[in-house]
């Protein structure tokens, strides 16, 4: 953990049990400050994809700590982007709250499905039933969904 990351964790009042978690050994890659839109975009690097609980805690504390200054965004960069089915599916509900994937039609259809993975490679399949408009969703929503997953640290997806 570098000093800047440590200072950020102090500012977020991150609990000791999280800070001592080996999965939470991070660094600040960069911070982009968008003055006009008042958004601070944090790029944080971790050894691997964070568990959903660690990610939610981090995102929440960033949002709260900077709420009087700006909105926050966080992109997780990982050294090891491997994942399993459980980790991938744990992040899926967050996807449906994010821009581009939060439309009622998309969430109503796809929130009932789960990803399957064959191995720890970059292969994940969303098994869906027979949908007449599947091509539309694949073209318009799946690339956005993939980008959101990449922002969570799923670099190999």
Give the role of each language-model region.
Residues 1-157:
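Intrinsically disordered, low-complexity basic tails and flexible linkers associated
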């Amino acid at each position: 953990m570098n000093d800047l990351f440590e200072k950020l964790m102090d500012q977020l009042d991150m609990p000791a049990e999280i800070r001592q978690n080996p999965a939470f050994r991070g660094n600040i890659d960069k911070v982009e400050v968008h003055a006009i839109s008042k958004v601070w975009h944090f790029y944080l690097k971790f050894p691997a994809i964070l568990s959903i609980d660690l990610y939610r805690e981090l995102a929440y504390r960033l949002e709260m700590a900077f709420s009087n200054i700006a909105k926050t965004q966080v992109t997780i960069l990982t050294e090891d982007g491997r994942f399993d089915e459980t980790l991938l599916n744990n992040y899926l509900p967050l996807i449906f709250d994010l821009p581009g994937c939060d439309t009622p039609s998309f969430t109503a259809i796809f929130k009932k499905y789960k990803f399957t993975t064959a191995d720890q490679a970059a292969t994940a399949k969303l098994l869906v039933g027979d949908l007449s408009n599947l091509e539309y969703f694949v073209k318009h929503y799946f690339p956005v969904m993939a980008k959101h997953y990449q922002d969570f640290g799923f670099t190999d997806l």
